[in-house]
Amino acid sequence: MKETKILSIQVGLPKMLDEAETTNSTGKPWTTGIFKTAICAPVWVGKHNLIGDAQADLSVHGGTHKAVNVYPSEHYPYWRQELHLTEMPYGAFGENFTTCGLLEDEVCIGDVFKAGETIVQV
């Protein structure tokens, strides 16, 4: 079995972006939950989200069957190069878990993983 690691865990609360910060097509303020901060302690994973984490649009993010967002660290070098960035911290894509060794083409709906004491299912 291939080894998978969680390299970083991030949480964050929704933030209102004003006209100066927004890049959406309307130019109007909007709320997003994409901004995450790395934590260095165990975190409780519940049915709807991680403790200290929340989503802005619950119709498409968070809640039952959408509690944890995972993104592979293997994609970060591509995006740093594509966006001409020297730094891009884990969590930049709004993910809760930044992993190593867990790529999309190796994961199927229904797969079950153990993360510490938590069991998560895709």
Language-model regions, residue ranges each:
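Electropositive, beta-rich accessory/interaction domains or terminal extensions
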Residues: 1-115, 119-122
